[in-house]
């Protein structure tokens, strides 16, 4: 609850570092404190790792530049030695060509393939150091045949369905095929969980358009991505992904080391503040903390700092102009998207206080977010899941209304009374209202602009006429 008051919108749980029982405890605790807080679970994803170091070497094996080793595939049972480095992918030798670079432990060690046989790769150390058990391996620019969903991922996805989770952040997504594999599991259980694809490797970048199309949202996970790409390439890569996501009406999250020094320090570095600010200037939907809140000494201060930076940057009205003229994917063929654009345009040209909408699924709220309007979108949700998923959308404040209404005028008046509990309204306040047809087809069907007094007066006239 302290995190929520400081500005947290979503709780993320990384399945790579927690058991199912531990994750269940986290979810139950969060929803006991506040049922409206969404939960995102990260899958571990398909990874290449060095196997366990043989006991005779202790905790690590030291290699120097120029040392040669054989690399072989394994089911994980073989132990790595000074002569043979085993990796947990049985077919790895088949997929990696001579000349390929292999980065171990986030690039702390690097080997290059100089020879290849049917059974092994002969590799030479380009960057030496201490190799430890279970360290990650990246192979830039090489496509390796890995499963879309590991057995552990499958168990956690099924756990997520049973435990009222809202988002699955799938790790190391390489193509739309990986997302479809997760979606098939969700569909088999009739789940509404939304998939966030984590972009962490070159293959994911190469297929970014199809990944965006197949996903609910995107996370730019700069840690592993920074291993495969040169550091100087990350800012432009991040910016291009953000632009593509906004055009496709997909929420986009920036993650990894945003306030990393706050793991040990109560204050961030100036460079970290600038990093957070840059992401906000790019108009991302969310910025994310990892180690800062998972294992840091100053978790509450980290959340408060990030929220404070975001509020300060968003005061810059000269930069944060609505994106109503952008060429957005499919917008010309979707009534909801056109009405959302009209509402944001009106809120730009008129002294509108809030954009107000009612939504069952959250789709209209997501479309309004895509146009990046300056005015807060107050989304009246009739389902808890819709309220939770809209917490990840730009500029949207989702609030839950348990009672669903069935006509336009009752919705307007009821929404005003309900919103007045959250944001005090004045009679002269002008609102842009985006509503649905209240019929079986769903979706937005009208935009109305009116002040609070006129809406209330009109409703009184309708009620009086109904009594006659």
Q: For each of these PLM feature ranges, what is it?
A:
Residues 2-3:
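Short, small-residue-biased leader/transition segments that mark boundaries at the very start
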Residues 9-20, 169-172, 218-229, 276-299:
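Glycine-rich phosphate-binding active-site loops on the catalytic face of alpha/beta enzymes
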Residues 10-12, 36-40, 68, 120-122, ...:
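Structural preference for beta-strand elements that scaffold enzyme active sites
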Residues 26-30, 293-314, 445-450:
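C-terminal helical cap(s) of enzyme catalytic domains, especially alpha/beta-barrels
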Residues 28, 45, 50-157, 397-400, ...:
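Beta-strand/loop-dominated core regions that host nucleotide or nucleotide-derived cofactor-binding catalytic loops
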Residues 145-256, 262-273, 280:
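Conserved alpha/beta-domain cores
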Residues 180, 196, 305-343, 460-467:
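Long, charged amphipathic helices and adjacent flexible linkers at domain junctions
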Residues 364-366, 372-411:
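Nucleotide-binding motor/catalytic cores of P-loop/tubulin-like NTPases across gene-expression machines
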């Amino acid at each position: 609850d302290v995190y929520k008051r400081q500005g947290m919108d979503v709780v993320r749980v990384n399945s790579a570092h927690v058991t199912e029982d531990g994750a269940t405890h986290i979810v139950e605790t969060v929803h006991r404190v506040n049922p409206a807080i969404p939960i995102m679970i990260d899958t571990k994803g398909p990874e290449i790792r060095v196997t366990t170091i043989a006991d005779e070497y202790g905790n690590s094996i030291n290699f120097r530049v120029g040392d040669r080793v054989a690399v072989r595939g394994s089911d994980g049972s073989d132990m790595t030695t000074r002569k043979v480095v085993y990796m947990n992918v049985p077919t790895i030798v088949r997929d990696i060509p001579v000349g390929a670079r292999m980065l171990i432990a986030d690039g702390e060690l690097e080997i290059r393939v100089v020879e290849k046989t049917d059974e092994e790769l002969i590799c030479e150390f380009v960057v030496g150091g201490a190799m430890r058990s279970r360290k990650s391996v990246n192979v830039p620019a090489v496509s390796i045949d890995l499963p879309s969903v590991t057995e552990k991922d499958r168990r956690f996805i099924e756990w997520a369905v049973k435990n009222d989770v809202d988002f699955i952040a799938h790790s190391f997504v390489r193509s739309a095929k990986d997302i479809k594999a997760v979606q098939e599991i969700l569909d088999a259980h009739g789940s509404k969980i939304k998939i966030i694809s984590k972009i962490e490797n070159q293959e994911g970048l190469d297929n970014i358009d199809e990944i965006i199309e197949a996903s609910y949202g995107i996370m730019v996970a700069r840690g592993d991505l920074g291993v495969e790409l040169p550091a100087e390439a990350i800012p432009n890569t991040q910016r291009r992904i953000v632009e593509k996501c906004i055009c496709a009406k997909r929420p986009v999250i920036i993650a990894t080391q945003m306030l990393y020094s706050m793991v040990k320090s109560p204050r961030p570095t100036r460079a970290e503040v600038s990093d957070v600010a840059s992401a906000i200037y790019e108009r991302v939907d969310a910025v994310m903390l990892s180690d800062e809140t998972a294992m840091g000494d100053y978790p509450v201060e980290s959340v408060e700092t990030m929220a404070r930076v975001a509020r300060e940057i968003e005061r810059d009205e000269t930069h944060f102009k609505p994106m109503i003229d952008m060429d957005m994917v499919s917008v010309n063929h979707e009534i909801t998207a056109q009405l959302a654009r009209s509402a944001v345009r009106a809120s730009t040209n008129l002294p509108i206080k809030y954009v107000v909408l009612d939504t069952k699924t959250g789709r209209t709220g997501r479309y309004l977010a895509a146009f990046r309007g300056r005015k807060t979108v107050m989304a009246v949700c009739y389902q808890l899941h819709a309220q939770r998923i809209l917490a990840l959308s730009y500029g949207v404040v989702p609030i839950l209304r348990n009672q669903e209404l069935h006509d336009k005028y009752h919705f307007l008046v009821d929404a005003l009374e309900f919103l007045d509990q959250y944001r005090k309204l004045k009679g002269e306040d002008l609102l842009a209202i985006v509503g649905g047809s209240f019929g079986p087809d769903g979706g937005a069907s009208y935009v109305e602009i009116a002040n609070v007094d006129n809406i209330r007066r009109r409703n009184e006239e309708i009620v009086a006429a109904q009594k006659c």
